[in-house]
Amino acid sequence: MDIDPYKEFGASVELLSFLPSDFFPSIRDLLDTASALYREALESPEHCSPHHTALRQAILCWGELMNLATWVGSNLEDPASRELVVSYVNVNMGLKIRQLLWFHISCLTFGRETVLEYLVSFGVWIRTPPAYRPPNAPILSTLPETTVVRRRGRSPRRRTPSPRRRRSESPRRRRSQSRESQC
């Protein structure tokens, strides 16, 4: 089976492959970032978004892969074979997990459309011969300030003003949202 873990999010393995392997932070840094920004939502029993679910699965996969690597390290007698397994896990599997973690953390942080726009911009930049491209690659965190995304075929919708309340009416109080998870 040819399964692309990015397809349902509008991206692809090929689109992420334009980013060099040293672009992605270490798994430890990515896990720390996910924990710092999204711990409550990731630990919540409630469904928050497909990106939260994918992030949970990638984190669980990495944990299981580390368990396997520990087992192999303890049970494989031949040091050369042990080194081959550890190297394969770190280089190949580590890169795939780093890409997954980066993609979903970035989508949650910047928005899916911005991340997709960034991947396309970077792909165009990297494929343009050096003599014809700007010296610096696009930067994700600055993209929303410079990118204008317009919906096709529609002019901006005008909002009609909401009906005014009489001054004697008091607005309804909102229920406390402290019990709800913050997705």
From Swiss-Prot:
It is found in: Virion; Host cytoplasm. Sequence repeats lie at residues 155-160, 162-168, 170-176. Its main location: virion. Phosphorylated by host SRPK1, SRPK2, and maybe protein kinase C or GAPDH. Phosphorylation is critical for pregenomic RNA packaging. Protein kinase C phosphorylation is stimulated by HBx protein and may play a role in transport of the viral genome to the nucleus at the late step during the viral replication cycle. Residues 155-176 are annotated as: 3 X 7 AA repeats of S-P-R-R-R-[PR]-S. The keyword Phosphoprotein applies. Pfam families: Hepatitis_core (PF00906). Residues 177-183 are annotated as: RNA binding. One of its GO terms (cellular component) is host cell. A motif (Bipartite nuclear localization signal) lies at residues 158-175. InterPro entries: Hepatitis_core, Viral_capsid_core_dom_sf_HBV. One of its GO terms (molecular function) is DNA binding. The modification Phosphoserine is found at S155, S162, S170. Residues 149-176 have a biased composition (Basic residues). It comes from the Viruses. Residues 136-183 are annotated as: Disordered. GO terms for biological process: microtubule-dependent intracellular transport of viral material towards nucleus; symbiont entry into host cell; viral penetration into host nucleus. HAMAP family: HBV_HBEAG. Self assembles to form an icosahedral capsid. Most capsids appear to be large particles with an icosahedral symmetry of T=4 and consist of 240 copies of capsid protein, though a fraction forms smaller T=3 particles consisting of 180 capsid proteins. Entering capsids are transported along microtubules to the nucleus. Phosphorylation of the capsid is thought to induce exposure of nuclear localization signal in the C-terminal portion of the capsid protein that allows binding to the nuclear pore complex via the importin (karyopherin-) alpha and beta. Homodimerizes, then multimerizes. Interacts with cytosol exposed regions of viral L glycoprotein present in the reticulum-to-Golgi compartment. Interacts with human FLNB. Phosphorylated form interacts with host importin alpha; this interaction depends on the exposure of the NLS, which itself depends upon genome maturation and/or phosphorylation of the capsid protein. Interacts with host NUP153. This is Capsid protein. It comes from Hepatitis B virus genotype C subtype adr (isolate Korea/Kim/1989) (HBV-C).
